[in-house]
Every structure is written in C-alpha cells, then in structure tokens.
Amino acid sequence: NILQLSNSESTLEINTLLLGCSTKSNNTDTVGQFGEGYKIAALVLNRLRKTFSVYNNSKDEIWISKFERSEVFNEKVLMFEIIPNHTNNDGLVIEIENVTLDEYNSLYDVWIGMPDAENHKAIETSYGRIFTEKDMRGEIFVNGLAVEKEKNLYFGYDFKPQYITVERDRKSCSTWDMRSTTSKMICE
C-alpha cells in the first residue's frame, strides 16, 4: 500500500519547502509554477492519515511530513523533518503510504501515464497529442494530467505545458489557449 512517484532527473532545494517557492517558475516543460503543489498535497494527505515522504536523493536527504504542535501558534502545523540519508541513487522519489487499491486505481482517471494504462490512439503534433478514439472526446490533459472535460470538442487532447496555462487548482485551463492550440494542432 505504498505509492512511489519518481523522477531520476529531479531534485528539490530546501527553499521549495516555503509556500510560493518553486523550481518550476521558469520551466515551460512542466505543469505548476505557483510553489504550492507538493506542500498542499502533503497537507491533504497527512489529514487523510497518509504518510508523505520525499526522498531527495541528490541531496542525500529524506523529508518526512507530519503534524506537530507549534509553541508559537499553539496549533498543530504541518512540518517537514529532514533526515540525512546517504544513497547512491539519484533524483527524487515521493512516497505515499497507506494508499488503498481503490485510491490507486482512481489515479488511472487523472493521469494517462500510469503503469499499464490504456494506450489510446493519438496523433502526435508539436503541441501535444490528439486523441482520436470516441471515448476520449473532450478529454483535456496537460502533460498527461487530466485537467477538464470539454463537451464541445470532437477529439481529446494532451497538451505540452508550454502551450497551455493551467489554473492554480489544475482542474481547468485557459479557454483561449486551449482553442488556439487545438486549431494549431489540427492544422499540423
């Protein structure tokens, strides 16, 4: 019941623990730039009694999120304990414990990059992929992450992040960007 999300190319700097700090701010190849993502995820998952740990291998550290009582605020606050962890591994692994099978299976609905996910027929373009199967009509993804469903679209789309502005909650995107980019994709 452990879910691991890994990226052999990634590393996190300590300042990204601060809300609003991000390593993605100027990276058009990634989704997210607000510096809130993994911190909010850690907060929500801890509230759901899941463990959320970051194996920041390139820094030889493990960051373990947990609630602790703050003497300053007299409240439980989310904090990260940083533990030295000398390893020969590279990259970043985010580990979430206490994941049920139903929770794991629900990830197939929101991320098309899941292991053993259905391989949908698609046309590759420089802007992303156009899904041609009927069951993918109106499905909108950015970099594989489900963003929204647009009933007026004949095809489904997986946009490269540099062409679409995703809203802070990642549940919607700029309609103008989407319409402009879909027309460019179809013209290709």
What annotation goes with each model-predicted range?
Residues 1-103:
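GHKL (Bergerat-fold) ATPase N-terminal catalytic module, capturing the glycine-rich phosphate-binding loop
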